[in-house]
């Protein structure tokens, strides 16, 4: 089995996250890979976003493990669907913040609200962070700090437990670039784990960037071809 993060692992992280479309080379690579191996995209994004960026019939673990899309069917993990209304309220209560924080972008997802700080001035970020943390306390949701983003998400779920529930004890390759992927590495220490990019990690292996990761996946795909011959 193969479990792959999307942003930063298969595609570069860009300033406009709504434009993270897979290029032709990646589409071809993942299409070939999933024909030979049981392959999942594991991401903080929604199923709809990944389906738009990577228009392939592929299984997914989304919202950092809060839901999955398997064989075309959406499954909410650990009762996460009870938070759907909570995130509606959070978005309604905070969407006016774009007037208070120039450059802030707010994205409503079914099981998350994401605040993108990439275009904000550094002097305003601590104040915004305090506001978001207060909202998290009020609504009982989890705060995640990523690259240029702060996200409010379903508490008590993570990529690690979601991957483990899918794979059981089957051999697996798991790759990711961000802090959320560390939970996947820790909970699946019997897998072949790959950290993409710089930073300390629990992964067994490390590659420089998404370009190197694609090269590894191409090699794995070719091994799959040879095995079938």
From Swiss-Prot:
Catalytic activity, reaction form: alpha,alpha-trehalose 6-phosphate + H2O = alpha,alpha-trehalose + phosphate
One Pfam family it belongs to: Trehalose_PPase
Amino acids binding substrate: 5-7
Alphabetical list of InterPro entries matching this protein: HAD-like_sf, HAD-SF_hydro_IIB, HAD_sf, OTSB-like, Trehalose_PPase
Signal peptide: none
List of residues binding Mg(2+): 5, 7, 177
Molecular function GO labels: magnesium ion binding; trehalose-phosphatase activity
GO biological process: trehalose biosynthetic process
Cofactor: Mg(2+)
Family designation: Belongs to the trehalose phosphatase family.
Full protein name: Trehalose-6-phosphate phosphatase-related protein
Source organism: Thermoplasma acidophilum (strain ATCC 25905 / DSM 1728 / JCM 9062 / NBRC 15155 / AMRC-C165)
Lineage: Archaea, Methanobacteriati, Thermoplasmatota, Thermoplasmata, Thermoplasmatales
């Amino acid at each position: 089995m193969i479990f792959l993060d999307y942003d930063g692992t298969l595609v570069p992280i860009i300033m406009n996250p709504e434009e993270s479309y897979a290029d032709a080379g990646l589409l071809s690579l993942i299409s070939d890979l999933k024909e030979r191996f049981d392959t999942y995209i594991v991401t903080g994004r929604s199923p709809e976003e990944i389906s738009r960026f990577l228009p392939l019939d592929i299984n997914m673990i989304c919202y950092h493990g809060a839901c999955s899309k398997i064989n075309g069917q959406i499954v909410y993990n650990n009762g996460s669907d009870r938070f759907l209304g909570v995130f509606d309220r959070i978005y309604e209560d905070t969407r006016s913040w774009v007037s208070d924080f120039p450059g802030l972008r707010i994205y409503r997802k079914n099981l998350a609200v994401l605040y993108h700080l990439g275009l904000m001035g550094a002097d305003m970020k601590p104040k915004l962070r305090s506001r978001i943390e207060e909202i998290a306390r009020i609504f009982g949701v989890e705060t995640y700090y990523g690259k240029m983003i702060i996200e409010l998400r379903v508490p008590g779920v993570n990529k690690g437990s979601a991957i483990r529930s899918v794979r059981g004890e089957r051999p697996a390759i798991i790759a990711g670039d961000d802090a959320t992927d560390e939970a996947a590495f820790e909970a699946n220490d019997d897998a072949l784990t790959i950290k993409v990019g710089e930073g300390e990690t629990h992964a067994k292996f490390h590659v420089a960037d998404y370009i190197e990761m694609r090269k590894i996946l191409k090699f794995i795909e070719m091994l799959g071809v040879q095995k079938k011959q």
